[in-house]
């Protein structure tokens, strides 16, 4: 296995390990969710709020908000501390991976770890949508503000609609019949999971990229690596295998809960052997240089159609397009998904050939 393949395989294995680490951080939120549950039940266990005059109600809502702030602030502090540790770990891991790939004769530099942490906080999130461009600390703080407002707003709305304390608590906690999955606190829990998974992806990617930049005499650019299974998003399917300069271009996470990663593309002096490594997919190991649509072409027709839809599946199989051509047809220059009509305008002959 040559140096480039070693790096690719190491990056993909690390991405799998990182998913386990994300789950561990998600699990830590259960403590804070329980504290919120206790806080709300305590504050709503007395007199019916519908009997409160406005000033008294606002005082109670302020008390609830301050309690939420304290709980979520502790969660944010813990998450930020974990992210700092992850940044250091990922940067060090990539330096070791580079050293292993290129051999002891070539010196690999470890970036200054304080600079890595600064880069994590100064680099914008690449997620598409409203959170795109945010820095990581405001991204976490916005979650705290949003969830507090959601809960305080639900209490205020319940009072003005004449709901009893019990009904308001049920709206917040959910019902036992639905395993409490239908309450506002479950929304908070799911949003916390997304924040953790997305935030850690950003931290890990930025830390890796800083190591690559510190070794720009060895690393030429970065390559996008997407998870090879049926849950991979449209944007990540199309970005699979694309290469970007060290100092520009899109980076994971491309969306909430993104599982993609980047791997270093070595300078030509280190990539002198043919590729032959392997990476993991949902149905076993495959070639390390296989892109998402290369892999998808190897899957059963039913699976292809379930992932990308019947028409796109037909186009992939019968349109006469290579995997790279098909991938380029999925996104515009701003990495936004194209509709079938948009795709038809760009490649009308492929649609004719596929009979669409």
Task: Locate predicted features.
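N-terminal leader/targeting and assembly helices and adjacent pre-domain segments
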Residues: 1-178, 272-356
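Acidic, glycine-rich two-metal-ion catalytic cores of nucleic acid-processing enzymes
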Residues: 169, 179-277
């Amino acid at each position: 296995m040559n140096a480039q393949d070693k790096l690719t395989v190491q990056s993909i294995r690390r991405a799998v390990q990182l998913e386990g680490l994300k789950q561990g951080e998600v699990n830590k939120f259960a403590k804070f969710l329980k504290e919120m549950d206790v806080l709300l039940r305590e504050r709503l266990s007395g007199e019916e709020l519908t009997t409160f005059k406005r000033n008294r109600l606002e005082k109670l809502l302020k008390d609830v908000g301050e309690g939420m702030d304290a709980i979520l602030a502790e969660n944010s502090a813990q998450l930020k501390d974990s992210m700092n540790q992850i940044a250091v770990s990922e940067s060090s891991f990539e330096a070791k991976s580079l050293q292993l790939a290129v051999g002891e004769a070539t010196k690999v530099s470890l970036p200054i770890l304080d600079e890595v942490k600064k880069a994590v906080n100064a680099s914008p999130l690449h997620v598409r949508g409203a959170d795109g461009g945010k820095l990581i600390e405001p991204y976490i703080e916005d979650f705290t503000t949003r969830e507090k407002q959601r809960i305080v707003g639900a209490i205020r709305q319940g009072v003005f609609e004449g709901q009893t304390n019990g009904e308001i608590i049920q709206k917040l906690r959910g019902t036992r019949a639905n395993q409490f999955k239908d309450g506002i606190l479950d929304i908070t829990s799911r949003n916390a999971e997304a924040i953790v998974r997305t935030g850690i992806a950003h931290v890990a990617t930025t830390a890796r990229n800083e190591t690559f930049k510190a070794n720009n005499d060895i690393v030429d650019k970065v390559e996008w690596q997407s998870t090879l299974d049926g849950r991979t998003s449209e944007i990540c399917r199309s970005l699979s295998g694309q290469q970007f300069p060290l100092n520009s271009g899109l980076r994971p996470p491309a969306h909430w809960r993104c599982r993609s990663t980047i791997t270093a593309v070595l300078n030509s002096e280190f990539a002198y052997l043919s590729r032959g490594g392997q990476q993991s997919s949902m149905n076993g190991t495959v070639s390390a240089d296989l892109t998402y649509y290369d892999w998808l072409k190897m899957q059963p027709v039913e699976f292809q159609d379930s992932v990308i839809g019947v028409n796109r599946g037909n186009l992939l199989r019968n349109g006469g397009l290579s995997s790279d051509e098909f991938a380029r047809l999925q996104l515009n220059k701003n990495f936004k998904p194209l509709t079938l009509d948009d795709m038809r305008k760009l490649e009308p002959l492929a649609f004719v050939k596929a009979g669409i």
